[in-house]
Amino acid sequence: MSKGPGPGGSAASSAPPAATAQVLQAQPEKPQHYTYLKEFRTEQCPLFVQHKCTQHRPYTCFHWHFVNQRRRRSIRRRDGTFNYSPDVYCTKYDEATGLCPEGDECPFLHRTTGDTERRYHLRYYKTGICIHETDSKGNCTKNGLHCAFAHGPHDLRSPVYDIRELQAMEALQNGQTTVEGSIEGQTAGAASHAMIEKILSEEPRWQETAYVLGNYKTEPCKKPPRLCRQGYACPYYHNSKDRRRSPRKHKYRSSPCPNVKHGDEWGDPGKCENGDACQYCHTRTEQQFHPEIYKSTKCNDMQQSGSCPRGPFCAFAHVEQPPLSDDLQPSSTVSSPTQPGPVLYMPSAAGDSVPVSPSSPHAPDLSTLLCRNSNLGSPSNLCGSPPGSIRKPPNLEGIVFPGESGLAPGSYKKAPGFEREDQVGAEYLKNFKCQAKLKPHSLEPRSQEQPLLQPKQDMLGILPVGSPLTSSISSSITSSLAATPPSPAGTSSVPGMNANALPFYPTSDTVESVIESALDDLDLNEFGVAALEKTFDNSTVPHPGSITIGGSLLQSSAPVNIPGSLGSSASFHSASPSPPVSLSSHFLQQPQGHLSQSENTFLGTSASHGSLGLNGMNSSIWEHFASGSFSPGTFPAFLSGPGAAELARLRQELEEANGTIKQWEESWKQAKQACDAWKKEAEEAGERASAAGAECELAREQRDALEGQVKKLQEELERLHSGPDPQALPTFSDLEALSLSTLYSLQKQLRAHLEQVDKAVFHMQSVKCLKCQEQNRAVLPCQHAVLCELCAEGSECPVCQPSRAHTLQS
């Protein structure tokens, strides 16, 4: 979380002693600033009370939800003092409950959630520049919509001072101002620059980009906690969320750690179990200052206001540098009679550029400059990196050419990690062009590789044209040529093409390299190559016009180049299977002293040693085979005798190998079909298992429901048996098992019930008919009410006839 300016380090405009009364007057506030100062988190959210607030998680609501989030409005009284201090915290305030014994009249600062009372105080709100950038909507990427710090000069406001602070400032203004105190009387923008100038004066190396990239926020701040007054200008970390692992000691990617960052919020780095050994970023600082992302995007503050408060500690680019052009020499530096070569501007100790001629004895080695701070030391470092490598292109910031402010390519408004394989390959190609133009390479590395490539050349010379093995070997030799530094060559007549140009992708991960590795495992002695060459040497006589292929001589004259046909670029786009012609006749006119004897043997001819085809092979070889009358895949006419039989056997073995490969492909297809069938059966079995599981779950739920019903019925039955009104008595054996006190209680209950039953019987006898005992009694003509109407019709009154009544009663 960004730190606001400290109590003594906040940006403010100085007030002279005569203007104290004027400063105490109420200053006008912008409408948005006034709204936040007056209403932010001062009232409870009405929607949260109804559980309808949608800004609770994450908590971004303008109003407070809990008491510990409540903020008191800061007010400056008529006497010039604040209603509560903007710096001194209350020791009685409970941060959990949000209650203070002195209530709102407490003269000290309450540490509410987010420290809102201090951040949105009249003294500090929007008086300092935020160190974090803004998103597309203009909101702070760290603190969100309610950021208490200014984003640009237009968002700054002048602080409101307490009368006591003004008096202290007047006292300091009378000649006792220190370096720290001088920051008090500056504007917000000047204060931030003053802080940066202070730290740069203590350690000038912070002005170097490489030093910032390697050391920024990697060491803890030496000042006590919460007493560092430099704020965002401090290059040291103050907590774990601000810490950055040194990229020199720890290797990690530019992607955030999923255990630390959830959504847009960075959590505690301690939640990651891997700790410092994690391969991902743990803090926003680590991600912004990662070597892959650092200075890869333009600074928003520089685009909006033309200045950045973070200065050299900003992770974004401040100066747009022109990209490296294809031709490293601009038009203004073309060689002239008065200017024999390109003029280089070398950085001096004073920081400016000094022109140095390449022929000057003080001119440094250009290859050393090109390879400084990069991996251009060897060709393997250039071409051996596999696709997808996160290594950035070599940096060429050590050389400055006329008309260019720098050679380091600057590209902005791109997502982090935009260095794809194709762009890396393009940068490698540009760097090779730079080396080829500035300093001729030695041919020793290429000549050292000839013994390794010689067996493959011999294999190429004895195999028929158009065979798969021949094309594989030619492709592998192409890869070998591409892996060596480019040799000096004349400018081709075809624009935009270079015979020494590198392949676009590193050659270590191509199909040719795989075949080349397979050929390294072959023993060429098994093919009888030595005997075949011996036969050729004995049966042929070399002459000046003959062509050498892998040490063997072919009785044929050297090819003749047709004038005017070399300027066309049709050979580069030809769709025919014939090999391409040579690139340019300029190669034929080069002195032979440029190439070593081993390289002449490798290229295959002494007359046209510099003429290379598209694939890096000698074009005269292809012209010789193309001029023949045989088709691809047939044997040349010069091959006869035992060598032809041996080649026929080799070709038969190759065909058998191809047939075996086809059989393996068929077997693989059958296995794949069987695997697909098994996979389908497994999916169906899984679906059936899922359906059975669902049915089992349904049956389990039904069983649980029935068990619940049985349990309820048992409880109801027990309640009936043990309740105050038992419906049935236990058996005699059960009574004996009861205790005497329980029996007494049961007897008492039964007697009470018996009395109730007697009363009910007596009542029913008094109202029911004495004869049927079902219908209610009716008044008879004799004025007696003992029988019902039905019984009175068929019988006489039992009262009038006592004997009858006695009979009925009995």
Curated annotation (Swiss-Prot):
Region annotated Disordered, chain positions: 1-24, 239-265, 324-343, 569-602
Main location: cytoplasm
Coiled-coil intervals, chain numbering: 643-723
UniProt keyword list: Coiled coil, Cytoplasm, Metal-binding, Phosphoprotein, Repeat, Repressor, RNA-binding, Translation regulation, Zinc, Zinc-finger
Gene designation: UNK
Location in or out of the cell: Cytoplasm
Record PTM Phosphoserine, positions in chain: 240, 374, 378, 385, 631
Biased composition (Low complexity): 10-19, 329-343, 569-585
Record InterPro entries: Unkempt-like, Unkempt_Znf, Znf_CCCH, Znf_CCCH_sf
GO CC annotation, single: cytoplasm
Summary of the function given for this chain in its UniProt record: Sequence-specific RNA-binding protein which plays an important role in the establishment and maintenance of the early morphology of cortical neurons during embryonic development. Acts as a translation repressor and controls a translationally regulated cell morphology program to ensure proper structuring of the nervous system. Translational control depends on recognition of its binding element within target mRNAs which consists of a mandatory UAG trimer upstream of a U/A-rich motif. Associated with polysomes.
Zinc fingers (C3H1-type) by residue: 84-113, 124-154, 215-241, 251-285, 293-321
Span of the signal peptide: none
Listed Pfam families: zf-CCCH (PF00642), zf-CCCH_11 (PF23261), zf-CCCH_UNK (PF25427), zf-CCCH_UNK-like_4th (PF23035), zf_CCCH_5 (PF18384)
A molecular function (GO) term: zinc ion binding
Biased composition (Polar residues): 586-602
Family: Belongs to the unkempt family.
RING-type zinc finger segments: 766-801
Protein name: RING finger protein unkempt homolog
Bias kind Basic residues: ranges: 241-253
A biological process from GO: cell morphogenesis involved in neuron differentiation
